[in-house]
């Protein structure tokens, strides 16, 4: 869903950031054997790589940072931050539901901004088909991006 939503929001002129939650204690962001990977393996607390087109940062932490802490790392360079995961973060959520997996939602409807599904659900929130990226982007734009 995010891979379709990001280009639609960018087409509308918005700068989009994404934070993905990874539930496991460790992950590989860098390529094993490359300089930055070797520096991290050697014990660097933080490793950044910068080029004319990108910046990447990996920093060791003693506890999992809250979503708002992660967002502050790049919030000044984007118009909106979308997340994957962070069910407990207290932010408006868009849940994706596929009938082949389950028709039971994970989130309580009171936490939902919308549902994107391939099957009908009787909920008090907007529902979009899996392919209705324009409609979903319209909702996000109205709710979070347009200023009065």
Enumerate the language-model features and the residues they cover.
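Solvent-exposed alpha-helices and their adjacent loops that cap or buttress functional pockets
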Residues: 40, 48-49, 73-74, 86, ...
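Phosphate/Mg2+-binding loops and adjacent switch elements
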Residues: 80-146
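Post-Walker A alpha-helix
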Residues: 1-2
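Short coil/turn connectors at secondary-structure junctions
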Residues: 12-15, 44-45, 76-78, 90-91, ...
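Phosphate-binding/switch loop-helix module in NTP-utilizing enzymes
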Residues: 59-88
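Charged helix-capping and loop-helix junction motifs
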Residues: 33, 63-67, 98-100
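N-terminal phosphate/diphosphate-binding loop that engages ATP/GTP or pyrophosphate donors
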Residues: 6-62
